[in-house]
A protein has these predicted regions:
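Active-site C-terminal subdomain of aminotransferase-like
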Residues: 194-275, 289, 358-359
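PLP-dependent aminotransferase-like
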Residues: 77-145
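A glycine-/small-polar-enriched, mobile loop at the entrance of the PLP active site in fold-type I
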Residues: 3-54
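Conserved active-site segment immediately N-terminal to the catalytic lysine
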Residues: 170, 184-195
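Conserved PLP-binding catalytic core of the aspartate aminotransferase-like
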Residues: 284-315
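Active-site phosphate-binding strand-loop segment of PLP-dependent enzymes
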Residues: 10, 110, 121-177
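Conserved N-terminal alpha-helix of the aminotransferase class I/II PLP-enzyme fold
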Residues: 33-79, 86, 101, 109
Length: 359
Protein backbone atom coordinates (compact mmCIF):
# COMPACT_ATOMS: atom_id res chain seq x y z
CA UNK A 1 0.00 0.00 0.00
CA UNK A 2 1.22 3.50 -0.81
CA UNK A 3 2.10 5.73 2.14
CA UNK A 4 -0.58 8.21 3.13
CA UNK A 5 -0.19 11.86 4.06
CA UNK A 6 -0.61 11.81 7.84
CA UNK A 7 -1.91 15.12 9.21
CA UNK A 8 -2.14 13.84 12.79
CA UNK A 9 -1.46 16.28 15.63
CA UNK A 10 0.84 13.64 17.10
CA UNK A 11 2.34 11.16 16.83
CA UNK A 12 3.06 12.54 13.41
CA UNK A 13 4.94 11.80 10.22
CA UNK A 14 8.65 11.08 10.36
CA UNK A 15 10.96 11.84 7.42
CA UNK A 16 11.02 8.91 5.00
CA UNK A 17 14.81 8.99 4.83
CA UNK A 18 14.93 8.65 8.62
CA UNK A 19 12.53 5.71 8.55
CA UNK A 20 14.58 4.04 5.83
CA UNK A 21 17.80 4.44 7.79
CA UNK A 22 16.19 3.13 10.97
CA UNK A 23 14.89 0.13 9.04
CA UNK A 24 18.36 -0.57 7.64
CA UNK A 25 19.91 -0.43 11.11
CA UNK A 26 17.17 -2.14 13.07
CA UNK A 27 18.75 -5.61 13.15
CA UNK A 28 22.38 -4.58 13.48
CA UNK A 29 23.30 -1.09 14.65
CA UNK A 30 26.76 -0.14 13.34
CA UNK A 31 28.15 -3.66 13.55
CA UNK A 32 27.11 -4.19 17.16
CA UNK A 33 25.13 -7.29 16.24
CA UNK A 34 22.04 -5.94 17.99
CA UNK A 35 19.20 -3.48 17.62
CA UNK A 36 19.06 -0.21 19.52
CA UNK A 37 15.74 -1.54 20.87
CA UNK A 38 17.52 -4.35 22.72
CA UNK A 39 20.93 -2.98 23.72
CA UNK A 40 21.77 -1.98 27.29
CA UNK A 41 21.41 1.70 28.02
CA UNK A 42 24.66 1.40 29.99
CA UNK A 43 26.59 0.04 27.03
CA UNK A 44 29.29 2.13 25.37
CA UNK A 45 27.45 2.03 22.04
CA UNK A 46 24.24 3.48 23.49
CA UNK A 47 26.09 6.07 25.55
CA UNK A 48 27.55 7.28 22.25
CA UNK A 49 24.03 7.55 20.80
CA UNK A 50 22.90 9.54 23.83
CA UNK A 51 25.89 11.88 23.68
CA UNK A 52 25.47 12.44 19.94
CA UNK A 53 21.75 13.19 20.32
CA UNK A 54 22.33 15.72 23.11
CA UNK A 55 25.21 17.39 21.27
CA UNK A 56 23.18 17.59 18.07
CA UNK A 57 20.24 19.08 19.94
CA UNK A 58 22.48 21.71 21.46
CA UNK A 59 23.99 22.50 18.07
CA UNK A 60 20.79 22.55 15.98
CA UNK A 61 18.80 24.65 18.47
CA UNK A 62 21.84 26.75 19.51
CA UNK A 63 21.31 25.92 23.18
CA UNK A 64 23.70 27.97 25.37
CA UNK A 65 26.23 26.16 27.58
CA UNK A 66 24.47 27.31 30.76
CA UNK A 67 21.49 25.04 30.01
CA UNK A 68 21.07 21.33 30.69
CA UNK A 69 19.36 19.17 28.06
CA UNK A 70 17.40 16.36 29.69
CA UNK A 71 15.94 13.37 27.85
CA UNK A 72 13.04 12.25 30.02
CA UNK A 73 9.84 10.20 30.00
CA UNK A 74 6.23 10.74 31.00
CA UNK A 75 5.20 13.09 28.21
CA UNK A 76 4.87 16.85 28.42
CA UNK A 77 1.93 16.40 30.79
CA UNK A 78 4.25 15.07 33.51
CA UNK A 79 6.09 18.38 33.36
CA UNK A 80 2.90 20.15 34.43
CA UNK A 81 3.79 18.90 37.93
CA UNK A 82 7.58 18.76 37.58
CA UNK A 83 7.87 22.46 36.76
CA UNK A 84 6.20 23.82 39.92
CA UNK A 85 7.89 21.15 42.05
CA UNK A 86 11.29 22.29 40.79
CA UNK A 87 10.69 26.04 40.53
CA UNK A 88 8.19 27.07 43.24
CA UNK A 89 10.97 27.50 45.76
CA UNK A 90 10.90 31.22 46.57
CA UNK A 91 7.68 33.20 46.80
CA UNK A 92 5.62 30.13 45.91
CA UNK A 93 3.91 32.20 43.21
CA UNK A 94 3.72 31.76 39.44
CA UNK A 95 1.96 33.48 36.53
CA UNK A 96 0.27 31.52 33.73
CA UNK A 97 -1.07 32.60 30.35
CA UNK A 98 -4.01 30.43 29.31
CA UNK A 99 -4.16 30.09 25.53
CA UNK A 100 -5.58 26.60 25.13
CA UNK A 101 -6.26 23.24 26.68
CA UNK A 102 -2.69 22.31 27.54
CA UNK A 103 -1.76 25.57 29.27
CA UNK A 104 -5.04 25.27 31.18
CA UNK A 105 -4.16 21.74 32.28
CA UNK A 106 -0.70 22.92 33.31
CA UNK A 107 -2.25 25.74 35.34
CA UNK A 108 -4.65 23.41 37.15
CA UNK A 109 -1.82 21.04 38.03
CA UNK A 110 0.39 23.87 39.30
CA UNK A 111 -2.42 25.12 41.56
CA UNK A 112 -1.82 22.04 43.73
CA UNK A 113 1.62 23.33 44.68
CA UNK A 114 1.43 27.09 45.11
CA UNK A 115 -0.21 30.46 44.56
CA UNK A 116 -0.84 30.41 40.82
CA UNK A 117 -2.30 33.40 38.99
CA UNK A 118 -3.82 33.70 35.51
CA UNK A 119 -2.14 36.73 34.01
CA UNK A 120 -4.02 36.56 30.69
CA UNK A 121 -6.46 34.26 28.90
CA UNK A 122 -8.06 33.94 25.47
CA UNK A 123 -10.83 31.63 26.65
CA UNK A 124 -13.36 34.43 26.04
CA UNK A 125 -13.04 33.82 22.28
CA UNK A 126 -12.51 30.05 22.34
CA UNK A 127 -8.72 30.46 22.42
CA UNK A 128 -8.71 31.88 18.88
CA UNK A 129 -6.07 34.52 19.62
CA UNK A 130 -2.99 35.18 21.76
CA UNK A 131 -3.45 37.87 24.45
CA UNK A 132 -1.04 40.78 24.40
CA UNK A 133 0.87 41.36 27.63
CA UNK A 134 3.70 43.57 28.86
CA UNK A 135 6.26 43.21 31.61
CA UNK A 136 3.97 45.15 33.96
CA UNK A 137 1.38 42.36 33.75
CA UNK A 138 3.72 39.89 35.45
CA UNK A 139 4.39 39.67 39.17
CA UNK A 140 8.10 40.47 39.70
CA UNK A 141 8.04 38.23 42.79
CA UNK A 142 6.79 35.18 40.88
CA UNK A 143 9.11 32.18 40.80
CA UNK A 144 8.32 31.73 37.10
CA UNK A 145 5.90 32.62 34.31
CA UNK A 146 4.41 30.02 31.97
CA UNK A 147 3.21 29.89 28.36
CA UNK A 148 2.40 27.27 25.73
CA UNK A 149 4.15 28.65 22.66
CA UNK A 150 2.03 26.80 20.06
CA UNK A 151 -1.49 25.59 20.71
CA UNK A 152 -2.12 22.35 18.85
CA UNK A 153 -5.89 22.16 19.30
CA UNK A 154 -6.78 25.74 18.39
CA UNK A 155 -4.09 26.43 15.80
CA UNK A 156 -2.52 29.48 17.44
CA UNK A 157 1.08 30.46 18.12
CA UNK A 158 2.66 33.26 20.12
CA UNK A 159 3.84 35.90 17.61
CA UNK A 160 6.12 37.31 20.30
CA UNK A 161 8.04 36.19 23.39
CA UNK A 162 6.55 37.82 26.52
CA UNK A 163 8.91 40.09 28.45
CA UNK A 164 8.80 38.82 32.03
CA UNK A 165 11.75 40.83 33.33
CA UNK A 166 13.84 38.82 35.78
CA UNK A 167 11.14 36.18 36.20
CA UNK A 168 12.14 32.92 34.43
CA UNK A 169 9.85 32.17 31.49
CA UNK A 170 8.81 28.54 30.98
CA UNK A 171 7.50 27.45 27.57
CA UNK A 172 5.79 24.28 26.41
CA UNK A 173 6.96 23.96 22.80
CA UNK A 174 5.71 20.42 22.16
CA UNK A 175 4.04 21.22 18.84
CA UNK A 176 6.62 23.67 17.48
CA UNK A 177 9.90 22.11 18.65
CA UNK A 178 12.58 22.48 15.95
CA UNK A 179 10.14 24.08 13.48
CA UNK A 180 12.10 27.35 13.39
CA UNK A 181 14.94 29.06 15.29
CA UNK A 182 14.26 29.81 18.95
CA UNK A 183 16.29 32.05 21.26
CA UNK A 184 16.57 29.67 24.19
CA UNK A 185 18.34 32.32 26.27
CA UNK A 186 15.02 34.15 26.67
CA UNK A 187 13.62 31.23 28.68
CA UNK A 188 14.27 29.53 31.99
CA UNK A 189 12.85 26.26 30.67
CA UNK A 190 11.86 25.09 27.20
CA UNK A 191 10.28 21.65 27.08
CA UNK A 192 8.09 19.40 25.01
CA UNK A 193 7.02 15.95 23.99
CA UNK A 194 8.99 14.66 21.01
CA UNK A 195 6.19 12.93 19.11
CA UNK A 196 5.30 15.81 16.80
CA UNK A 197 8.56 17.09 15.32
CA UNK A 198 11.45 15.30 16.99
CA UNK A 199 10.97 11.54 17.42
CA UNK A 200 8.40 8.80 18.05
CA UNK A 201 6.30 9.00 21.21
CA UNK A 202 8.04 8.20 24.48
CA UNK A 203 10.64 10.96 24.75
CA UNK A 204 10.21 14.28 26.56
CA UNK A 205 12.93 16.90 26.21
CA UNK A 206 13.54 19.52 28.92
CA UNK A 207 16.03 22.34 28.36
CA UNK A 208 16.56 24.01 31.73
CA UNK A 209 18.84 26.87 32.76
CA UNK A 210 21.41 25.51 35.19
CA UNK A 211 20.79 28.11 37.90
CA UNK A 212 17.21 26.78 38.17
CA UNK A 213 18.40 23.22 38.84
CA UNK A 214 18.87 21.91 42.37
CA UNK A 215 16.12 23.83 44.14
CA UNK A 216 13.31 21.30 44.04
CA UNK A 217 10.93 20.77 46.93
CA UNK A 218 11.57 17.94 49.36
CA UNK A 219 8.42 16.17 48.17
CA UNK A 220 9.61 16.08 44.55
CA UNK A 221 9.76 12.48 43.27
CA UNK A 222 13.23 11.45 42.14
CA UNK A 223 11.98 10.95 38.58
CA UNK A 224 10.77 14.58 38.44
CA UNK A 225 13.83 16.17 40.06
CA UNK A 226 15.82 18.00 37.39
CA UNK A 227 19.05 17.86 39.42
CA UNK A 228 18.72 14.13 39.86
CA UNK A 229 18.21 13.64 36.14
CA UNK A 230 21.01 16.07 35.20
CA UNK A 231 23.47 14.47 37.62
CA UNK A 232 22.69 11.08 36.09
CA UNK A 233 22.92 12.25 32.47
CA UNK A 234 19.20 11.50 31.96
CA UNK A 235 19.85 7.87 32.91
CA UNK A 236 18.65 7.68 36.50
CA UNK A 237 16.52 4.85 35.15
CA UNK A 238 16.31 3.19 31.73
CA UNK A 239 15.68 5.98 29.21
CA UNK A 240 13.50 5.62 26.07
CA UNK A 241 16.44 4.33 24.04
CA UNK A 242 14.72 3.89 20.68
CA UNK A 243 13.11 7.35 20.75
CA UNK A 244 16.46 8.93 21.62
CA UNK A 245 18.10 7.11 18.70
CA UNK A 246 15.33 8.30 16.37
CA UNK A 247 15.73 11.83 17.74
CA UNK A 248 19.38 11.66 16.72
CA UNK A 249 18.44 10.63 13.19
CA UNK A 250 15.86 13.43 12.89
CA UNK A 251 18.39 16.00 14.11
CA UNK A 252 20.88 14.78 11.51
CA UNK A 253 18.15 15.14 8.87
CA UNK A 254 17.43 18.73 9.94
CA UNK A 255 21.13 19.56 9.94
CA UNK A 256 21.56 18.10 6.45
CA UNK A 257 18.64 20.19 5.14
CA UNK A 258 20.27 23.39 6.32
CA UNK A 259 19.18 23.76 9.93
CA UNK A 260 16.28 25.60 11.51
CA UNK A 261 16.41 28.65 9.23
CA UNK A 262 15.77 26.39 6.26
CA UNK A 263 13.13 24.48 8.23
CA UNK A 264 11.33 27.74 8.97
CA UNK A 265 11.27 28.66 5.26
CA UNK A 266 9.82 25.26 4.37
CA UNK A 267 7.19 25.47 7.09
CA UNK A 268 6.18 29.03 6.20
CA UNK A 269 5.79 28.02 2.56
CA UNK A 270 3.58 25.04 3.45
CA UNK A 271 1.40 27.05 5.80
CA UNK A 272 0.98 29.86 3.25
CA UNK A 273 -0.32 27.44 0.62
CA UNK A 274 -2.99 26.15 2.98
CA UNK A 275 -3.99 29.45 4.59
CA UNK A 276 -4.14 31.25 1.25
CA UNK A 277 -6.61 28.72 -0.09
CA UNK A 278 -8.74 28.72 3.07
CA UNK A 279 -8.91 32.53 3.02
CA UNK A 280 -10.04 32.52 -0.61
CA UNK A 281 -12.53 29.69 -0.16
CA UNK A 282 -16.29 30.17 0.03
CA UNK A 283 -16.70 26.90 1.96
CA UNK A 284 -13.74 26.64 4.31
CA UNK A 285 -12.74 29.16 6.96
CA UNK A 286 -10.19 29.55 9.75
CA UNK A 287 -11.24 31.22 13.04
CA UNK A 288 -7.79 32.30 14.24
CA UNK A 289 -6.64 35.91 14.25
CA UNK A 290 -4.21 36.19 11.33
CA UNK A 291 -1.18 37.36 13.32
CA UNK A 292 -1.57 34.45 15.74
CA UNK A 293 -1.90 31.62 13.23
CA UNK A 294 0.19 28.51 13.82
CA UNK A 295 2.67 27.28 11.22
CA UNK A 296 2.22 23.73 12.49
CA UNK A 297 -1.51 23.24 13.14
CA UNK A 298 -4.00 24.69 10.66
CA UNK A 299 -7.62 24.51 11.83
CA UNK A 300 -10.59 24.97 9.50
CA UNK A 301 -14.33 24.33 9.24
CA UNK A 302 -17.02 24.22 6.57
CA UNK A 303 -19.77 25.67 8.76
CA UNK A 304 -21.69 22.39 8.78
CA UNK A 305 -21.02 19.40 11.05
CA UNK A 306 -22.34 17.09 8.34
CA UNK A 307 -20.03 18.54 5.71
CA UNK A 308 -17.11 18.42 8.14
CA UNK A 309 -17.69 14.70 8.72
CA UNK A 310 -18.08 14.06 5.00
CA UNK A 311 -14.86 15.91 4.26
CA UNK A 312 -12.86 13.96 6.85
CA UNK A 313 -14.21 10.65 5.56
CA UNK A 314 -13.62 11.35 1.88
CA UNK A 315 -10.19 12.83 2.58
CA UNK A 316 -9.13 9.65 4.39
CA UNK A 317 -10.27 7.56 1.43
CA UNK A 318 -8.13 9.77 -0.80
CA UNK A 319 -5.03 9.25 1.37
CA UNK A 320 -5.20 12.33 3.62
CA UNK A 321 -5.59 10.87 7.10
CA UNK A 322 -6.17 12.22 10.63
CA UNK A 323 -7.73 15.51 9.55
CA UNK A 324 -10.52 15.40 12.12
CA UNK A 325 -10.28 18.26 14.59
CA UNK A 326 -9.85 17.73 18.31
CA UNK A 327 -12.95 16.32 19.98
CA UNK A 328 -13.32 19.48 22.09
CA UNK A 329 -13.66 21.84 19.09
CA UNK A 330 -14.65 19.72 16.09
CA UNK A 331 -14.04 20.77 12.51
CA UNK A 332 -10.76 19.88 10.85
CA UNK A 333 -7.10 20.30 11.63
CA UNK A 334 -4.14 19.76 9.33
CA UNK A 335 -0.95 19.35 11.30
CA UNK A 336 1.87 20.11 8.88
CA UNK A 337 4.95 19.39 10.96
CA UNK A 338 8.52 19.33 9.67
CA UNK A 339 8.28 15.92 8.00
CA UNK A 340 5.16 16.79 5.98
CA UNK A 341 6.39 17.43 2.42
CA UNK A 342 5.08 20.43 0.52
CA UNK A 343 3.54 17.98 -1.95
CA UNK A 344 1.27 16.72 0.82
CA UNK A 345 -0.09 20.22 1.43
CA UNK A 346 -0.45 20.97 -2.27
CA UNK A 347 -2.37 17.75 -2.86
CA UNK A 348 -4.57 18.41 0.18
CA UNK A 349 -5.47 21.84 -1.22
CA UNK A 350 -6.30 20.26 -4.58
CA UNK A 351 -8.59 17.83 -2.78
CA UNK A 352 -10.23 20.69 -0.84
CA UNK A 353 -10.87 22.57 -4.08
CA UNK A 354 -12.51 19.53 -5.62
CA UNK A 355 -14.58 18.91 -2.49
CA UNK A 356 -15.81 22.51 -2.49
CA UNK A 357 -16.68 22.27 -6.17
CA UNK A 358 -18.74 19.11 -5.64
CA UNK A 359 -20.51 20.19 -2.46
Amino acid sequence: MARVFNFSAGPSMLPESVLSRAAAEIMDYHGSGQSVMEMSHRSKVFEEIMDEAQNLFRSVLSVPDNYDILFLQGGASTQFAAIPLNLLNGSGKADYMLTGQFSTKAYKEACKYGDIRVVASSKDKTFSYIPEVTRDDFDPEADYAYICLNNTIYGTKFPYIPDTGDVPLVADVSSCFLSEPLDVSKFGIVYGGAQKNVAPAGLTIVIVRKDLVGKSRDITPAMLDYKNMADNDSMYNTPPCWSIYMCKLVLEWIEKLGGLEEMKKRNEAKAKILYDFIDSSKMFSNPVRHCDRSLMNVTFVTGSDELNAKFVSEAAEAGFVNLKGHRSVGGMRASIYNAMPVEGVEQLVDFMKEFEKNN
